[in-house]
Structures are given as C-alpha cells and as structure tokens.
Amino acid sequence: MGKVVGFTGRILPQFDTGEMGKYVNTPETPIFVKSRVLYGLHKSKGAIRDQGKVLLVEGQMDCLMAHQAGIKNAVATSGTALTLDHLKLLKKLTDQLILNFDNDEAGIQAGERAIDLATANDFNVRVVRFAPGTYKDAAEAVQADPPGFLKLIEQAVPAIEFYFIRYLPSGHTSASGSSHILELKKGVRTVLGKIKNLSSSVE
C-alpha cells in the first residue's frame, strides 16, 4: 500500500475524438487490478478510521480535489465499479459509506449498483446528491464551492431516501392520467425491490 502500481493520463482536448473516455489508465497487470485497488486509501485510512466513515468517489481527480479541500477520508474506485474486494478493504476501517459518484445517468446507475452491493454486505450507505444541472462530479463541486461541497456531504441521505427521490419524484410530471399512474406504479415496484435488498435493520 502506498506504492506506485499504475498511471492515469488525460487525453488532451486537441486529441479528444470522443471515441474513448477522457482518462486512460495503465492496462491491468499482476500488480494493478482496478477491482482490488482503491485510489488514495494509503493516505485516507487514518482519517477513515478516526472519523468512522469513508467518502467514496468515482475518479482520481475527485479524490485529489476532496483531499485538497480537507476531506481526508476520501477514496476513489478509479472509474471502475465498486467490488467486493474494495468493500473488504474498507470493512477493515469502517462500515459507514458515503457515496458520491458522477452526476450523469451512467454515474447514477453505477452508484445504485454500489449501494446494492454495499448494503448487501452490511454497510450503512448514505448518498451525496447534486441538484440536476449543477456539478458533474466531486472535483467540479470542490473547485466551485469547497464549503458547499462539505455541506452536501453533511446532508447525504440514506440509501432508501435516495431511491425514493430517484424513482418517486415529487412535483409535476410530463405524464398525465393513466400514463402517470403506470409510471408511479413502476416507480413503487422499483423502490419496493430496492427496500427488499437493503439489509440494514435501521433502514
């Protein structure tokens, strides 16, 4: 832990054709398996243990920016899915997980899978929410408003509340009549399925 196992590079804008992600990682090797590595853990484990919780972000830059803002308990999955190996590393330090993946549909879906996996393995999960159309990720939020990002972390909602907000949105909807009822029923079924999978007795 704390040794160099790989590198990440950013595609320069003038060479970005849109055919690949903005960041390129070292190919996996016997010593670099992304599903077993949490970026920043060697720097964060003391703060995680002291605070009794971990902030899990998606990218390395998210983690770096969080640390620069004084959020020393942040680690990143390096853009890959959260895995059981990741959770085993974290479980040695805490079972309190605060999740903040990217604020796009792909990031939100990855966050859902992370919630389901973590709660199934006895983690208490809370989710940091960005309002639609605001920040795309933790790095952008920290750069724009460090105190505001800290406040969002403090306001992280329980996993079940996140699912209610995502699948049973309040306010007006573009659907009406029977289509609105069908949409609502679908949302209720989804939330009930998520609740069934949550293992925390508190939730």
List each language-model region with its residue ranges.
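Phosphate-handling DNA/RNA-contact segment within nucleic-acid enzymes
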Residues: M1-L93, L97, A110-G111
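Generic hydrophobic alpha-helical scaffold/packing signal
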Residues: K45, K91, I115, A139, ...
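Acidic, metal-coordinating catalytic cores used for nucleic-acid/nucleotide bond scission
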Residues: M61, L82, F101-G111, R129-K136
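Short secondary-structure boundary/capping segments
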Residues: G70-A74, A114-L117, V142-P146
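Flexible glycine/proline-rich, aromatic-decorated loop/lid segments
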Residues: L87-L90, D116-T119, P158
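Histidine- and aromatic-rich ligand-binding microenvironments
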Residues: Q96, D102-N103, E154, E161
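Conserved acidic, small-residue-rich alpha-beta core segments centered on
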Residues: I98, A110-N121
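C-terminal or mid-to-C-terminal helical accessory/interaction module adjacent to the motor/catalytic core
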Residues: N124-V202
